[in-house]
Design a protein with these regions (language model features):
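Short, Lys/Arg-rich flexible segments
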Residues: 2-30, 88-95, 113-120, 126, ...
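Assembly/oligomerization interface modules of large self-assembling protein complexes
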Residues: 2-82, 286
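Sequence/fold signature of self-assembling virion shell proteins
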Residues: 4-6, 94, 187-301
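Structured loops at beta-to-helix junctions and adjacent beta-edge loops in soluble globular domains
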Residues: 47-49, 86, 174-176, 214, ...
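Short loop/turn segments at secondary-structure transitions that flank enzyme active sites
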Residues: 50, 89, 114, 177-179, ...
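Short helix/loop capping segments that flank catalytic or ligand/cofactor-binding pockets
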Residues: 53-55, 93, 180-183, 280-282
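Alpha-helical scaffold segments that mediate packing/assembly in large oligomeric complexes
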Residues: 84-164, 289-301
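Extended, solvent-exposed, turn-rich assembly/linker loops in the middle of proteins
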Residues: 129-205, 209
Length: 301
């Protein structure tokens, strides 16, 4: 039985699985305190919450606080992944077909997770390896801290510059930063100073703060190197979600990924999955970024 090559809308259950797999490859998704929401564009009204309770004497006049609401518009972007395989897959038995297709979808879901970090942190297209026009990179808008030779002091400096309006509930580490922190030991005992530092995307902790590690933090595909070591702050300020309608199609003809090779001519078919992200950074002052001294950027120390 040949595969159906029409463009199909993935069922809600499958779309939800792909969305959750994005959490396994994105530090932003991993550190977000809430589940990803499936939505299109969204306007956020930022509520500053500066009111304080007033002590009122018997019969005294009561005063109010006028709240200012600042709108932040979500930024929407479309993502796609295309994977070429041998056209013989169309005629494979059902078990083999299911296994291979599942691996393709898992690989594409992982790519969709990584692209979230690349767009939000760096305004960068990881496939084309180009800067995205019209996007504001968090690496440039967050409060900058220049790294020193003392990584413990660097963590303290990051925490100091985050606006005191916000809680610190997450830190995203580059692999370089995570490895350096794991090497720090208490001189008197030899124990690790940060024993729960993660070396992968499984959330660990640093000083009680949820932590995740990935090459997307520094943007390993970006040249020249960004020099970014970590982002720390209130990750609830990064609102993101994926559209529920995730499309997948099997393409038999043409050159859908612009490789210069026609699918029929090389006996291949292509799997393509498309989705739509939307995100907004409510206040970049609630997040700090640690950069090596050689990288450019403003310093808040």
């Amino acid at each position: 039985m040949a595969l159906d090559t029409s463009k199909v809308l993935l069922p809600k259950e499958v779309a939800t699985v792909i969305t959750k797999r994005a959490k396994d490859t994105s530090t932003i998704a991993a550190l977000s305190p809430s589940e990803p929401q499936l939505f299109l564009d969204k306007d956020y009204m930022v509520f500053t919450g500066n009111s304080e309770a007033e002590v009122v004497a018997e019969g005294a006049q009561k005063y109010s606080y006028e709240e200012t609401l600042t709108p932040v518009v979500g930024k929407r972007f479309k993502v796609q992944t295309t994977t070429r395989v041998s056209s013989e897959l169309q005629w494979a038995d059902e078990d083999a077909k299911l296994e291979i297709t599942s691996k393709i979808l898992a690989d594409q879901a992982a790519a969709m997770g990584r692209v979230l970090d690349y767009v939000v942190y760096h305004a960068f297209d990881p496939k084309k390896k180009t800067t995205l026009e019209g996007f504001n990179a968090l690496a440039k808008s967050a409060v900058g801290v220049t790294a020193t030779d003392d990584r413990v002091a660097d963590i303290d400096s990051l925490a100091e510059v985050v606006s005191d309006e916000y809680d610190i509930n997450g830190i995203a580490l580059s692999k370089t930063m995570a490895n350096e922190l794991r090497k720090i030991r208490v001189p008197s005992t030899g124990q690790r100073f940060y024993p729960e530092i993660p070396i992968n995307l499984q959330v660990g902790s640093l000083d009680g703060i949820p932590a995740a590690t990935s090459g997307t933090v520094n943007g390993r595909l970006i040249t020249p190197a960004t020099g970014i070591l970590a982002f720390l702050g209130d990750f609830r300020l990064i609102k993101w979600g994926m559209v529920r309608d995730i499309w997948s199609e099997i393409i038999e003809y043409g050159d859908p990924d612009n490789t210069g090779k026609d699918l029929k001519g090389v006996n291949q078919i292509a799997y393509r999955t498309e989705a739509m992200y939307s995100y907004a950074i409510l206040d970049p002052k609630g997040i700090a970024v640690l950069k090596k001294p050689t990288s450019t950027g403003r310093t808040a120390k």
